[in-house]
Every structure is written in structure tokens, then in C-alpha cells.
Amino acid sequence: MKKDIHPDYRPVVFLDTTTGYKFLSGSTKSTKETVEFEGETYPLIRVEISSDSHPFYTGRQKFTQADGRVDRFNKKYGLKDANTAQ
């Protein structure tokens, strides 16, 4: 294997800017900001969305029904779906 071709993988703190939630993970992303977390100093990476603020993980996700071409055709000509009739 070639030497010195892999980026530096190290522990970093990710900060969700919408909620203020911090978590420690490994990353190769470089940053000049640092933060004290659990008694240690780590590089800080700011993110807009994390598991603490994403609607899927918080339970605030809304599902919308996207009608496809077949559904529109059936609706237009008054046909019923064979799968839902049973």
C-alpha cells in the first residue's frame, strides 16, 4: 500500500445548529474550530440537520401521496384498482 495517501481520520464533535445537540463521531473533515466535549478538546463541525432535528427521526414527518400515471388514468376513466377491490 502507498503511504500518506489516506486522509487523517480522527474523532470530531458535530453540532446541530438548529437544536444545539452535540455528538462525537469519527471524520476526515478538516476544520479550524474546536470545542470542549466530555472533558476533551475536539475539532467542531457544524451541521444544519442531524438525528435530533430531522423530521424522520423526531416523528414529525408528513407523508404525501404521489399519484402516478396509472392512478391518474384510472381516476380519469372511473376504473377501480384490482388490488384494492379484494
Curated annotation (Swiss-Prot):
Pfam families: Ribosomal_L31
Superkingdom as given in the UniProt entry: Bacteria
Keyword hit for Ribosomal protein: yes
Cleaved signal peptide residues: none
Any one of the GO CC terms: ribosome
BP GO terms, sorted: translation
UniProt keyword annotations, A-Z: Ribonucleoprotein, Ribosomal protein
SUPFAM superfamilies attached to this UniProt entry: L28p-like
Any one GO molecular-function label of the UniProt entry: structural constituent of ribosome
Assembly, per entry: Part of the 50S ribosomal subunit.
Annotated NCBIfam families: L31, PRK01678.1
HAMAP family listed in its UniProt record: Ribosomal_bL31_2
Family assignment from sequence similarity: Belongs to the bacterial ribosomal protein bL31 family. Type B subfamily.
Protein name: Large ribosomal subunit protein bL31B
Organism: Streptococcus agalactiae serotype Ia (strain ATCC 27591 / A909 / CDC SS700)
GN (gene name): rpmE2
